[in-house]
């Protein structure tokens, strides 16, 4: 039986190992000669992000509960959290507290920790959570509790993802897992050297196949020289549909259950669309459409948002069949899967329909199809190798959208001013890593917020710490300067000393969008990304609020 202390040491060794091979070897050596039950537990806890158990608490909630347990200042603990990881903060205050004395020696087994996590996932009341967290702390050393909290937080900070961990079991375990998503089955079959026998398991989610961005038509043909399908990119929600007899399961892009109000209607229509299917797995997109089957905007699937579209209903656009009545179809070419889908599915107008697909043979044809999609206010196209197999979790497709054209610079970018900053988390804890971007409102003479922006590399962040002149306000509403109009949810840790002397950044994104939380007339940017610093501009030449309003109007008239 593996002890928590042994597991902690393994995590420490993995963290300090230099590369993929060394990390995997450490895990392989550790699990050698252990039985399947023990190996399964070790691998499962090394991958807390894949664990289905939900603990109903984020970092701030964990801080709140342990501030009560330790009788420590919640504000002090939150401030400490701003400089690093949740595990380090809890360990620090556990060591200092006088309510529960940390154990001198580690006594917990991994099985006991796993049992605790299962129990914790079953409670939702704060009083019950406090009791469980108190009980586990009473049998922990400081380092034990740090590890337990990081398991609750679903991030051990060992710099080793699923590929590193699973391939320690067998060289192809990771690829097999992306298809089956059944860790226990992989461990049992790896011991028998029988991984090839593992297939899709109906009612268990499969890692969806993904797409990478493509910024030109020419690049698409270099990627798929033997031909491609161009499929409309629907602005809805990816849904993986599983049917087994009269049971149904619906999983999102991240393999979590889809909210019932979005998919319950499908239980009536899927048996009608697939009359011969006993068990089936479909890859699809659920979209709200109007009475003419025209897709409505992203985000309209929400209960409250849907009420704005009275004559609408949810429609499933099916683009792939991965499994049908005992037959795993992921290893056959796409054109065959699509042909099979046409044979077994009957469309139900406005409820279950085929995705719009075009067989592309030349660049001119692809350009025409893309122009048509954008003219119809659709998001773009997904391009797929006509002979491609379905590779779970891999980015083998291409997505080509309005904002990816022109070498990646999009039409709807804005030159925004850095107004503030937030502490980063994890490895970026203690430094400014996320930035509040905004624009000047000539009418009020105030600065308004548009979006938050992150994604800088470590070197850039290091330079920005010195380049940006900031004043620390610690999210205190009383310290917001008069020149800044910001809603409570976006009050930063720092504000710039003078916005008129601050940096101007070109910010691009998927599209301008509406946000009640931002103060620039509710205008924001969906999926914002930093493009470059506009050193050639002063604040006067930056995008002002009236420019932003005009820009969104002109873009909306085009798209």
Curated annotation (Swiss-Prot):
BP GO annotations: cell division; DNA biosynthetic process; DNA recombination; double-strand break repair; lagging strand elongation
A GO MF term: metal ion binding
SUPFAM superfamilies found in the cross-reference section: ATP-dependent DNA ligase DNA-binding domain, DNA ligase/mRNA capping enzyme, catalytic domain, Nucleic acid-binding proteins
Keyword vocabulary terms for this entry: ATP-binding, Cell cycle, Cell division, DNA damage, DNA recombination, DNA repair, DNA replication, Early protein, Host cytoplasm, Ligase, Magnesium, Metal-binding, Nucleotide-binding
EC number: 6.5.1.1
Induction per the UniProt record: Expressed in the early phase of the viral replicative cycle.
Protein residues bound to Mg(2+) 2: 379
A Pfam family this chain is assigned to: DNA_ligase_A_M
Subcellular location: Host cytoplasm
Residue sites binding ATP per the record: 231, 238, 285, 384, 399
Positions bound to Mg(2+) 1: 285
Swiss-Prot/TrEMBL catalytic activity: ATP + (deoxyribonucleotide)n-3'-hydroxyl + 5'-phospho-(deoxyribonucleotide)m = (deoxyribonucleotide)n+m + AMP + diphosphate
NCBIfam families cross-referenced by the UniProt entry: dnl1
Family membership noted in the UniProt record: Belongs to the ATP-dependent DNA ligase family.
Role summary: DNA ligase that seals nicks in double-stranded DNA during DNA replication, DNA recombination and DNA repair. Recruits cellular topoisomerase II to sites of viral replication and assembly.
Name of protein: DNA ligase
Organism: Monkeypox virus
Gene: OPG180
């Amino acid at each position: 039986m593996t002890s928590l202390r042994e597991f902690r040491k393994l995590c420490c060794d993995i963290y300090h190992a230099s590369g993929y091979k060394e990390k995997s070897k450490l895990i392989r050596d550790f699990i050698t000669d252990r039985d399947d039950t023990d190996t399964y537990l070790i691998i499962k806890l090394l991958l807390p992000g894949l664990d289905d158990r939900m603990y109903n608490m984020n970092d701030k909630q964990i801080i709140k509960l342990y501030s009560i347990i330790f009788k420590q200042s919640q504000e002090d603990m939150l401030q400490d959290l701003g400089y690093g990881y949740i595990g380090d903060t809890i360990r620090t205050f556990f060591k200092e507290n006088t309510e529960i004395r940390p154990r001198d020696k580690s006594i917990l087994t991994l099985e006991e920790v796993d049992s605790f996590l299962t129990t914790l996932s079953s409670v939702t009341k704060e009083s019950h959570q406090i009791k469980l967290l108190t009980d586990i702390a009473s049998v922990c050393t400081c380092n034990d509790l740090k590890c337990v909290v990081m398991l609750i937080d679903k991030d051990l900070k060992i710099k080793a993802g699923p590929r590193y961990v699973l391939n320690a079991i067998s060289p192809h375990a990771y690829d097999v897992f992306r298809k089956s998503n059944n860790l226990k089955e992989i461990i049992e079959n790896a011991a028998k050297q029988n991984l090839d026998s593992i297939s899709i398991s109906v009612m268990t989610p499969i890692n969806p196949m993904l797409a990478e961005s493509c910024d030109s038509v020419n690049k698409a043909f270099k990627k798929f020289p033997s031909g491609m399908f161009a499929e409309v990119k629907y602005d809805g929600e990816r849904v993986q549909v599983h049917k087994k007899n009269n049971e149904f399961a619906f999983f999102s892009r991240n393999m979590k259950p889809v909210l019932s109000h979005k998919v319950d209607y499908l239980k009536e229509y899927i048996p009608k669309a697939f009359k011969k299917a006993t068990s089936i797995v479909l890859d699809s997109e659920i979209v709200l459409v109007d009475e003419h089957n025209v897709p409505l905007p992203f985000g309209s699937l929400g209960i409250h948002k849907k009420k704005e579209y009275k004559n609408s209903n949810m429609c499933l656009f099916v683009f792939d069949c991965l499994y049908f009545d005992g037959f795993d179809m992921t290893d056959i070419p796409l054109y065959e899967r699509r042909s099979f889908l046409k044979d077994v599915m009957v469309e139900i107008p406005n409820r279950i329909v085929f995705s719009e697909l075009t067989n592309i043979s030349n660049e001119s044809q692809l350009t025409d199809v893309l122009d048509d999609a954008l003219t119809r206010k659709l998001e773009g196209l997904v391009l797929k190798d006509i002979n491609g197999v379905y590779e779970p979790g891999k980015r083998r497709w291409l997505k080509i959208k309005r904002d990816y054209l022109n070498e990646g610079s999009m039409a709807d970018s804005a030159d925004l001013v850095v107004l503030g900053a937030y502490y980063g988390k994890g490895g970026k804890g203690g430094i400014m890593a996320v930035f509040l971007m905004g624009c000047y409102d000539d009418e009020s003479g105030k600065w308004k917020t548009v979006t938050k922006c992150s994604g800088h590399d470590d070197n850039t962040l290091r330079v920005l710490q010195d380049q940006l002149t900031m004043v620390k306000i610690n999210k205190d509403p009383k310290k917001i300067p008069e020149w800044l109009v910001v809603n409570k949810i976006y009050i930063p840790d720092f504000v710039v000393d003078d916005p008129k002397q601050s940096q101007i950044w070109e910010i691009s994104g998927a599209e301008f969008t509406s946000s009640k939380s931002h103060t620039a007339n509710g205008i924001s940017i969906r999926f914002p990304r930093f493009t470059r610093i506009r050193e050639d501009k002063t604040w006067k030449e930056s995008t002002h609020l009236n420019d932003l309003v005009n820009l969104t109007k002109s873009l909306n008239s085009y798209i």
